[in-house]
C-alpha cells in the first residue's frame, strides 16, 4: 500500500510518538538496570519481611491500641557496613531495604526521630461562592450591562454554597487514607482543606481541624511545609533537567542535621538519587522536564517527577489529588506501595484521591472515606467498608473491585440493592449521611477522635506546638526566623533561587542567543538608517530620532517579561505551598540572573547603534550613554515585572502594559516636546522614567558642542553682520554655528544640569518599582478555587434553574456540576443508528518513522478486522502503539511510512474514507463558545451528505441528544473546565459529534475512559456496547479496564511493545476464549477473583511464557494467527461479490473528499466564527477599548494642533503614534486564530468536515466588521480632537483610511500566523516587520536623508503610503503661522526693508515675512502653507487616493500570502525523505 501522510497537529503526533519511543527505550533501560524500576522491585523477600517488622513496630509505638513498651528494632540494624555499595543509589547493587536501615540507624545514633503528625477534623464544613445559574455573556449583553446593574449586583452577592458538609475524621501518623467519590463530589476540596489550601473557600465557625493539637491557622502560618497538597496538574520549569528540578527541591528542604554529617549539597544530591531510583527516574537525570512545547520526559515520567518533588518535601502529612492520572496500573500500584513504605518507616500520613483504584491498590490503605455530593457517607477502616455498605443493603457484583463498589453506591444508575432491600436502602446523599451518622461505625469513629483528642488536646500554646517548634528549629538553618515555615534563611533562599535561575538561562540559551541576535539586527537597521548623520544643524532631528529609538528599544525589550513571569507563577506558588522559599526570593533571584543577560544585550545593541549612527565619539559621552540605557532597561524591567505582580491574569497585565507603553512613548519628550504638552496630560512626563533617560541622552549628546549651520536664511553669498541667521531653532543672528545647549533648551526645554538629577530619579524609580514588585510577588496570589458550574445561553436555561426550583437529586454545591451526571437516565434509543454492512479489514500493517536519525518500527505486521455489530478492544502495555495503530487505520498520521493493506469490503480505500468514519479522540477539543446542540448540528450539517435535508439533519441531532441522554445540557455552553461541561459531559459530546456525522463505516475511539472515574467509564462502555448491538462497528483503545468493563467487549487486539500482536480474536464468555489461549501456550492460570485484563498485562509484561518463548513468536506460529489471515481472505471474497452490484447506485458525492460543496462549507464556517466572536465580549471589548483609549489619548495629547511648524510636525507624529498600536492589534488577533486552527487541524480537518480554504477565508472575513467598527471609533476619538472639523471629502477619506488601517492589521495578523506553529514565534516576526515598516515610513528619517541602500524599504513599507495619505488629507492648504521660537530673526542691510532684502530669496525658497516693511528684526517663517512642509518629506496632496488604493493592494497581498503560506506549510505534505535521498544521490 502507498505511503499515507495525513494531517494532524504535529505537536500531538510528536508527543505521542516520543512517549511511545521513550517508553520502549525505558523498557530496554529497565531490562539492563532493574534496580531503578520501583521501590518494591529493589527489595528482596527477606528485606520486605525485615522492613515490615520494623514498620509494624513503629506503627505499634504510634498507635493508641498498643502499649508503648513494645521492643524496639532488632539488633540486625547495627550490622550494616557504612561502606556497603548497596546503599549507593547510583550503584548497580543499590538496595532500598539496606539504605532505609542505614538511615534509621543513623537517626537513632543522633537521637533524632522522624517528625510525625496526625490530623483531626470535626463538623468540618467548607463553603464557596458561585451563582447556581450562569449565563453566557455576549456582545449584546456587554452593551446592555448598564441597564442590568441590579441583576448583576444580585448575582455578585450570591449566598455561599456548601461544598463539604460536617465531615468528621481522624488520620493518624503512619496511616494511608483513600478518598473515594465521583467527579464533583468534593474530593479535591477535601484534600485542599486538609492542607489549608483555602483560596476562594471558607470554613464554618463550627469547624474544628487541628494537627495533634496545633490549630490549622497556626500550622499553615508557621509549619506550612509540614502539610502539603499535590495537585493533579504537573507544573515544572520545562527547561530544567529532572536532576536539577529534584535537587532544588532537596536543597530547599535539607535539614540542618544530616546523616553522616554530609554537607548540604552532598545530602541533597544523595537523597535526590535515592528518590529518583525509587520512582524509576534515574535514567532521566540529565533530561529536561519539558512540557507541551518543550521536548522532555514523557507524560508518565513528568507525573513521577511531580510525585518525587513532593516526596522530597519530607512532609509528615501529604494529600495527593488524583496523582496516578496518566500512570499505567503497574506504576500507580508502585507509587502507592512507596507511600505505604514511607508511612510505615517515617510515620508520615497520606490522603490519596484515586478515580480508578484496582483491588491491589485498595488493599494497601488503612482507611477510606466515601464522599457523595459533598457529604461524608463513610469514614473508617478500608477492610470494613465493603461489609458496611453490604449491610446497608447494596449488592457488590462478582469481580467488582471494592473501590469501584464503594463509588458505585453514589451512582443511582449503577448501584443495585440486594433482593428484599429495595425499599430499605438510602437513596439521596442526605439519606446516606443520616444512615452513616446512626451507624456503630460512626460512633466508633467519634469515640476514637475523642480518645485521640485527650492525648493531643487542641491548644493555642500547648505541648504539641512546642514540640513542633522544637523539631522545626532542629532542622532550620542558622539565622532563620523561628516563626518562619521555611528551613532556609532568606539569603540562602536567594542563593538557591539564583543558582536555579542561571540554570534556566543556560538550559534555554538558544532563547537568549536569539534575543541578542534580534537586538543586533535592530541595532544594525536603526544605526544604518541614521548612518552618516552630519555633526551639523541638518542632523539635529536625526540625532534626536536616533536617541529616541535607542531609549525606547532598550526600555521596551523588557515587556516580554510579563509572559515569562505569568508562565512561572503557578510553579512558584506550588513551591511556596511546599515551604521551599519565599516568592519574593525567587523574584530577587530573577532580577539578579537578568543582570549579565541584560548587560550583554545592552553592550551589543548600543555599541553597534552608537558608532554606526555617528553619535558623539567621546569616551565620557559613550559610557554615560551606555550607563543610561542599561539603567533604563532595568527600570522598565521593574515596571513591567510590577505590572505582572499586581495583576491576576496575563490579559490584564498586557492590557495595562499596552496603555502604559503608549503613554511612555508620547511623553518621552520627542514626538511631543515639553512646550507642546497640554496641561491635562502634562503630568505624565514627570512620572515617565523614559522621559528622564531621554533628557539625559539628549543633553549628553548636545552639551558643550557647537554645530555648524547647514542652511542660512537668506542663502546669499558674502553674508556679514546680523543680516543672516541659521535656519534651526536656537539660532542667533550673525552666528555661523549653534550651541547644542541652546538648541535643546529652545526645542526640548532640556538642560545638561539635569543629567545627574535625572540619574538619581531613575535609581529612585528602580528601587521603588523593585520594592513594589517584591512585595506584590510575596502577597499576590492568582490561585483560587472556582466554581464548577454549567453556563447556558441567555433565554435557553433549563426551567428548573430559571425558577430556582431544585431538580431531584441535583447537585448544588459549588464544586459539583450544575446537574446530575448524564448517564443516569434510561437506556437511550439506539434505533436511529442506520444498520451497517461494510467490513473494514487490515493486513500486515507496519509503521516506520525516523527518530534521531535512526529508523524505528512502531507497528509490526498487525492484521485484523472490525465487523458491524461488534465492539473490539485495542489494548497493550504502555508504549505498545495503541493510539498509533488507531491513527494509522484512520489515516491520521502526518509523518513516517506506512506499509500493508487496508480494505473496506475487500476493496481499497477512496478519498471519502476519512469522512465516512468517526474518530473520537482522547483530547476533548470543542469550540468553547458553542452549545452542545450547536456543536452537534455543525457536525451533522457538514458531514452528512447533501441528499439529506437540513431539517432531517437537525432531527437526527435531536435523536443523538436523546440517545446520549444530553437533554438537560443540550443548550449548555462547552466552556472551559470548571466553567462549562465537566469531564464526562465533554467526552459524551466528543462521541456525539462523531455520531451526528452518521459515519457509515465504523467508529474509532481513543481512550474514551481516560480521566473518568470508574462509574463514568462504565457508563461510556455500556453505551458503546448498546451502540455495537444496534449494528455499529466500533474499535476502541482502552487503558486498564476492570473485569466487569472488560466483559463488554466482543473482540480483543492486544499489542506488545514495538506494535507486535500477541492476540487477536474473541474474548469469550467470562474471558474463557482469551484465557484458554494464553494458558494453553504456557501462561500461569488466572485466578477466579483476578481481573483477566490485569492478568494478561502482567504475563505479557513478563515478556515470555513458561518455556521462555516470546509472546509475539507464540502468536505468529499459532493456529489463531493463521485463522485471522483465513478469515480476512473469506471476508474479501464474500464482500467483493456484494459490492460490485451496489457500486452502480453510488452518487458522485459519495466518493468526494467532503460531504458538502465549498460554498455551503464557507457559509456554515463563517456563521459559526461570527457566532463565536459575538460570544466573546472580552475579546471584542479589548479591541474596541484599545481603539477608543488610543484614539482619545493620542487625540487629546496632540489636541488642536497649532498651525506652527511644530504643530505640523506633531500632526505627523500623531500619525506615527497611531501606527505604533499596530503591533498590539496584531497580537490580539493571533492567539484567537491559533485556538481556532488547533480545533480545525486536530479534529475537523482529519474528519474532512470542511476545506482549509473555508476555514481561512471565514476567519479573515469575520474580523473585518469588528475592524471597521474599531476604525470608526478610533477615527471619532482621534481625528476631531487633533484637527477639528474639515470639509466632507477630507472627513470621509480620513474615515476610510482609519478603517483601512485596522483591516490591514487583521489581514497582516493572519498572514503572519498562517504558517507559524505558535503565537510566540509569529510575534517575533511581527515585531521585526512592524519595526522595519515604522522605521522606514519617512517620519523619523526623511527619504532624502536615508542611505541609498534603504530607499527600497521606504517604498516597500505600507505605512509610507498610509501616513502620506493621512497627513496630506489633514494638512493640505493649511496656512502656517510660525511660533516666536520658530521665527528666523535677523537685520536687513541698512537702507533696505525686510521685504526688499528677502524678495529674491523668497521667490526661490518660499516662506513668509510677518513684517516686510520693517528695517530691523525681520521675522521670517520658512513655510507659508503646510504643503511646503509636506513636500519636504515627500508627501503630496495629489497622491492621496493613489496611496489609499495602494493600501488595498497590501491588504489583498496579505490575504494571498496567508493562503499560500498556510497551504505550503500546513496543508501540503512534502516528501522530505524523497528529497533527501535525491540530494544524497547527487552528492
From Swiss-Prot:
Residues bearing glycans: 32, 123, 322, 718, 780, 947, 1146, 1413, 1471
MF (Gene Ontology): ABC-type transporter activity; ATP binding; ATP hydrolysis activity
Residue stretches making up the ABC transporter domain: 147-398, 840-1083
Induction: Expression is highly up-regulated in azole resistant strains and in the presence of miconazole.
Signal peptide: none
Record's subcellular location: Cell membrane
Disrupted-gene phenotype: Leads to slight miconazole susceptibility.
Gene Ontology CC entries for this record: plasma membrane
Biased composition (Polar residues): 71-82
UniProt-listed SUPFAM superfamilies: P-loop containing nucleoside triphosphate hydrolases
Residue positions binding ATP: 876-883
Catalytic activity: (R)-miconazole(in) + ATP + H2O = (R)-miconazole(out) + ADP + phosphate + H(+)
CDD domains in UniProt: ABCG_PDR_domain1, ABCG_PDR_domain2
Record's keyword terms, sorted: ATP-binding, Cell membrane, Glycoprotein, Membrane, Nucleotide-binding, Repeat, Transmembrane, Transmembrane helix, Transport
Parts of the chain that traverse the membrane: 512-532, 539-559, 595-615, 620-640, 654-674, 759-779, 1179-1199, 1215-1235, 1254-1274, 1293-1313, 1320-1340, 1444-1464
Family the entry assigns: Belongs to the ABC transporter superfamily. ABCG family. PDR (TC 3.A.1.205) subfamily.
UniProt-listed PANTHER family: ATP-BINDING CASSETTE TRANSPORTER (PTHR19241)
Protein name, entry field: ABC multidrug transporter atrA
Gene: atrA
Amino acid at each position: 500500500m502507498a505511503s499515507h501522510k495525513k494531517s494532524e497537529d504535529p505537536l500531538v503526533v510528536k508527543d505521542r510518538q516520543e512517549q511511545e519511543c521513550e517508553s520502549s527505550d525505558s523498557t530496554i533501560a529497565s531490562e539492563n538496570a532493574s534496580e531503578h524500576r520501583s521501590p518494591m522491585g529493589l527489595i528482596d523477600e527477606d528485606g520486605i519481611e525485615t522492613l515490615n517488622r520494623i514498620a509494624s513496630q513503629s506503627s505499634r509505638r504510634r498507635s493508641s491500641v498498643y502499649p508503648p513498651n513494645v521492643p524496639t528494632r532488632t539488633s540486625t540494624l547495627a550490622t550494616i557496613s557504612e561502606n556497603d555499595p548497596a546503599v549507593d543509589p547510583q550503584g548497580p547493587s543499590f538496595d532500598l531495604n539496606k539504605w532505609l536501615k542505614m538511615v534509621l540507624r543513623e537517626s537513632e545514633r543522633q537521637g533524632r526521630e522522624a517528625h510525625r503528625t496526625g490530623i483531626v477534623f470535626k463538623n468540618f464544613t467548607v463553603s464557596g461562592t458561585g451563582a447556581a445559574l450562569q449565563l453566557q455573556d455576549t456582545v449584546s449583553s456587554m452593551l446592555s450591562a448598564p441597564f442590568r446593574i441590579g441583576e448583576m449586583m444580585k448575582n455578585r452577592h450570591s449566598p455561599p454554597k456548601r461544598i463539604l458538609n460536617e465531615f468528621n475524621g481522624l488520620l493518624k501518623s503512619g496511616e494511608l487514607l483513600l478518598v473515594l467519590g465521583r467527579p464533583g463530589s468534593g474530593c479535591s476540596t477535601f484534600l485542599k482543606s486538609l492542607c489549608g489550601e483555602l483560596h476562594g473557600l471558607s470554613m464554618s465557625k463550627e469547624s474544628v481541624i487541628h494537627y495533634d493539637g496545633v490549630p490549622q491557622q497556626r500550622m499553615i502560618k508557621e509549619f506550612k511545609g509540614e502539610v502539603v497538597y499535590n495537585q493533579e496538574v504537573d507544573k515544572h520549569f520545562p527547561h530544567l533537567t529532572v536532576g536539577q528540578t529534584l535537587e532544588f527541591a532537596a536543597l530547599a528542604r535539607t535539614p540542618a542535621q544530616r546523616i553522616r554529617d554530609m554537607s548540604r549539597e552532598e545530602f541533597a544530591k544523595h537523597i535526590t538519587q535515592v528518590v529518583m531510583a525509587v520512582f524509576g527516574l534515574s535514567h532521566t537525570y540529565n533530561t529536561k522536564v519539558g512540557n507541551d512545547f518543550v521536548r522532555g520526559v514523557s507524560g508518565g515520567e513528568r507525573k513521577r517527577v511531580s510525585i518525587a518533588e513532593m516526596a522530597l518535601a519530607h512532609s509528615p502529612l501529604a494529600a495527593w489529588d488524583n496523582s496516578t492520572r496518566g500512570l499505567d496500573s503497574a506504576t500507580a500500584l508502585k507509587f502507592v506501595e512507596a507511600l505505604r513504605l514511607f508511612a510505615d518507616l517515617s510515620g508520615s500520613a497520606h490522603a490519596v484521591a484515586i478515580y480508578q483504584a484496582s483491588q491491589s491498590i485498595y488493599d494497601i490503605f488503612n482507611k477510606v472515606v466515601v464522599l457523595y455530593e459533598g457529604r461524608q457517607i463513610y469514614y473508617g477502616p478500608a477492610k470494613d467498608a465493603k461489609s458496611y455498605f453490604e449491610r446497608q443493603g447494596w449488592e457488590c457484583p462478582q469481580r467488582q473491585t471494592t473501590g469501584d463498589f464503594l463509588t458505585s453506591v453514589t451512582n443511582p444508575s449503577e448501584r443495585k440493592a440486594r433482593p428484599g432491600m429495595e425499599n430499605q436502602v438510602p437513596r439521596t446523599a442526605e439519606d446516606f449521611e443520616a444512615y452513616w451518622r446512626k451507624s456503630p461505625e460512626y460512633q466508633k469513629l467519634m469515640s476514637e477522635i475523642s480518645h485521640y483528642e485527650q492525648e493531643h488536646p487542641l491548644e493555642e500554646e500547648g505541648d504539641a506546638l512546642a514540640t513542633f517548634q522544637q523539631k522545626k528549629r532542629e532542622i532550620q538553618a542558622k539565622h532563620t526566623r523561628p516563626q518562619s515555615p521555611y528551613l532556609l534563611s532568606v539569603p540562602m533562599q536567594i542563593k538557591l533561587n539564583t543558582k536555579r535561575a542561571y540554570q534556566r538561562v543556560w538550559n534555554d540559551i538558544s532563547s537568549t542567543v536569539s534575543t541578542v541576535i534580534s537586538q543586533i539586527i535592530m541595532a544594525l537597521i536603526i544605526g544604518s538608517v541614521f548612518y552618516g548623520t552630519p555633526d551639523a544643524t541638518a542632523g539635529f532631528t536625526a540625532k534626536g530620532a536616533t536617541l529616541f529609538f535607542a531609549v525606547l528599544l532598550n526600555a521596551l525589550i523588557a515587556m516580554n517579561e510579563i509572559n515569562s513571569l505569568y508562565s512561572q507563577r503557578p510553579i512558584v506558588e506550588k513551591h511556596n505551598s511546599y515551604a521551599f522559599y519565599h516568592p519574593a526570593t525567587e523574584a530577587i533571584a530573577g532580577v539578579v540572573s537578568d543582570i549579565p543577560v541584560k548587560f550583554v544585550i545592552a553592550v551589543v545593541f548600543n555599541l553597534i547603534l552608537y558608532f554606526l549612527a555617528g553619535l558623539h565619539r567621546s569616551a565620557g559621552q559613550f559610557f554615560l550613554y551606555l550607563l543610561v540605557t542599561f539603567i533604563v532597561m532595568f527600570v522598565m524591567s521593574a515596571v513591567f515585572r510590577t505590572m505582572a505582580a499586581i495583576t491576576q491574569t496575563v490579559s490584564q497585565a498586557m492590557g495595562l502594559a499596552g496603555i502604559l507603553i503608549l503613554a511612555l512613548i508620547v511623553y518621552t519628550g520627542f514626538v511631543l516636546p515639553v512646550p507642546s504638552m497640554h496641561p491635562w496630560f502634562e503630568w505624565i512626563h514627570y512620572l515617565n522614567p523614559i522621559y528622564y533617560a531621554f533628557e539625559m541622552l539628549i543633553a549628553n549628546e548636545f552639551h558643550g558642542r557647537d554645530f555648524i549651520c547647514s542652511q542660512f536664511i537668506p542663502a546669499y553669498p558674502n553674508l556679514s553682520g546680523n543680516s543672516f541667521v541659521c535656519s534651526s531653532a536656537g539660532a542667533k543672528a550673525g552666528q555661523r554655528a549653534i550651541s547644542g545647549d541652546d538648541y535643546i533648551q529652545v526645542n526640548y526645554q532640556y538642560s545638561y544640569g539635569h543629567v545627574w538629577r535625572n540619574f538619581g530619579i531613575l535609581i529612585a524609580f528602580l528601587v521603588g518599582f523593585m520594592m513594589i514588585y517584591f512585595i506584590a510577588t510575596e502577597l499576590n496570589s492568582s490561585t483560587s478555587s472556582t466554581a464548577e458550574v454549567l453556563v447556558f445561553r441567555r433565554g435557553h436555561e433549563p426551567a428548573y434553574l430559571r425558577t430556582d426550583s431544585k431538580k431531584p437529586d441535583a447537585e448544588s454545591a459549588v464544586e459539583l456540576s450544575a446537574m446530575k451526571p448524564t448517564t443516569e437516565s434510561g437506556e437511550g434509543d439506539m434505533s436511529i443508528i442506520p444498520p451497517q454492512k461494510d467490513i473494514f479489514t487490515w493486513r500486515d500493517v507496519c509503521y516506520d518513522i525516523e527518530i534521531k536519525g535512526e529508523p524505528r518500527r512502531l507497528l509490526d505486521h498487525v492484521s485484523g478486522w472490525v465487523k458491524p455489530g461488534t465492539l473490539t478492544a485495542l489494548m497493550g502495555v504502555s508504549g505498545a502503539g495503541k493510539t498509533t495503530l488507531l491513527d494509522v487505520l484512520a489515516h491520521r498520521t502526518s509523518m513516517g511510512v506506512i506499509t500493508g493493506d487496508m480494505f473496506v469490503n475487500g476493496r481499497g480505500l477512496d478519498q471519502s474514507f476519512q469522512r465516512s468514519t468517526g474518530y473520537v479522540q482522547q483530547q476533548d477539543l470543542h469550540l468553547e463558545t458553542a452549545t452542545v446542540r450547536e456543536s452537534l448540528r455543525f457536525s451533522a450539517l457538514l458531514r452528512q451528505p447533501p441528499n439529506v435535508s437540513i431539517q432531517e439533519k437537525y432531527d437526527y441531532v435531536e435523536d443523538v441528544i436523546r440517545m446520549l441522554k444530553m437533554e438537560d445540557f443540550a443548550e449548555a455552553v462547552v466552556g472551559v473546565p470548571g466553567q462549562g461541561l465537566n469531564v464526562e459531559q465533554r467526552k459524551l459530546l466528543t462521541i456525539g459529534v462523531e455520531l451526528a456525522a452518521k459515519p457509515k463505516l465504523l467508529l474509532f475511539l481513543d481512550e474514551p475512559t481516560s480521566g473518568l472515574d470508574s462509574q463514568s467509564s462504565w457508563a461510556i462502555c455500556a453505551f458503546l456496547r448498546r451502540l455495537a448491538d444496534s449494528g455499529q462497528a466500533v474499535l476502541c483503545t482502552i487503558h486498564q479496564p476492570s473485569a466487569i468493563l472488560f466483559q463488554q467487549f466482543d473482540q480483543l487486539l492486544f499489542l506488545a511493545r514495538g506494535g507486535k500482536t500477541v492476540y487477536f480474536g474473541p474474548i469469550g464468555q467470562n474471558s474463557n476464549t482469551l484465557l484458554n489461549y494464553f494458558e494453553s501456550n504456557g501462561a500461569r492460570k488466572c485466578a477466579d477473583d483476578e481481573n483477566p485484563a490485569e492478568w494478561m498485562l502482567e504475563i505479557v509484561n513478563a515478556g515470555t511464557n513458561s518455556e521462555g518463548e516470546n509472546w509475539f513468536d507464540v502468536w505468529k506460529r499459532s493456529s489463531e494467527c493463521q485463522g485471522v489471515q483465513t478469515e480476512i481472505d473469506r471476508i474479501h471474497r464474500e464482500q467483493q461479490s456484494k459490492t460490485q452490484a451496489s457500486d452502480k447506485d453510488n452518487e458522485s458525492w459519495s466518493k468526494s473528499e467532503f460531504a458538502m460543496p465549498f460554498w455551503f462549507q464557507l457559509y456554515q464556517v463563517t456563521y459559526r466564527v461570527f457566532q463565536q466572536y459575538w460570544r466573546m465580549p472580552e475579546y471584542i471589548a479589548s479591541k474596541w477599548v484599545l481603539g477608543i483609549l488610543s484614539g482619545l489619548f493620542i487625540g487629546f495629547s496632540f489636541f488642536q494642533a497649532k498651525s506652527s511648524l511644530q504643530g505640523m510636525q506633531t500632526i505627523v507624529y500623531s500619525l506615527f503614534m497611531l501606527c505604533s498600536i499596530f503591533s498590539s492589534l496584531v497580537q490580539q488577533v493571533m492567539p484567537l486564530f491559533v485556538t481556532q486552527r488547533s480545533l480545525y487541524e486536530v479534529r475537523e480537518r482529519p474528519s474532512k468536515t470542511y476545506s482549509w480554504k473555508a476555514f481561512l477565508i471565514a476567519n479573515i472575513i469575520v474580523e473585518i466588521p469588528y475592524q471597521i467598527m474599531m476604525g470608526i471609533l478610533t477615527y471619532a476619538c482621534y481625528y476631531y480632537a487633533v484637527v477639528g472639523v474639515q470639509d466632507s471629502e477630507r472627513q470621509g477619506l480620513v474615515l476610510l483610511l482609519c478603517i483601512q488601517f485596522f483591516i490591514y492589521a487583521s489581514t497582516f495578523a493572519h498572514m503572519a500566523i498562517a504558517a507559524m506553529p505558535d503565537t510566540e514565534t509569529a510575534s517575533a516576526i511581527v515585531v521585526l516587520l512592524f519595526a522595519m515598516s515604522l522605521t522606514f515610513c519617512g517620519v523619523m528619517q526623511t527619504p532624502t536623508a536615508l542611505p541609498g541602500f534603504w530607499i527600497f524599504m521606504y517604498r516597500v513599507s505600507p505605512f509610507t503610503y498610509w501616513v502620506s495619505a493621512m497627513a496630506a488629507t489633514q494638512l493640505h492648504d493649511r496656512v502656517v503661522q510660525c511660533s516666536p521660537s520658530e521665527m528666523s530673526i535677523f537685520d536687513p542691510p541698512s537702507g533696505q526693508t525686510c521685504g526688499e532684502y528677502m524678495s529674491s530669496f523668497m521667490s526661490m525658497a518660499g516662506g513668509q515675512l510677518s513684517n516686510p516693511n520693517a528695517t530691523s528684526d525681520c521675522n521670517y517663517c520658512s513655510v507659508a502653507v503646510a504643503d511646503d512642509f509636506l513636500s519636504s518629506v515627500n508627501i503630496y496632496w495629489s497622491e492621496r487616493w493613489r496611496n489609499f488604493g495602494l493600501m488595498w493592494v497590501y491588504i489583498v497581498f496579505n490575504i494571498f500570502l496567508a493562503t499560500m503560506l498556510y497551504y505550503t506549510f500546513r496543508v501540503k505534505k512534502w516528501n522530505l525523505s524523497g528529497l533527501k535521498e535525491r540530494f544524497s544521490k547527487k552528492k
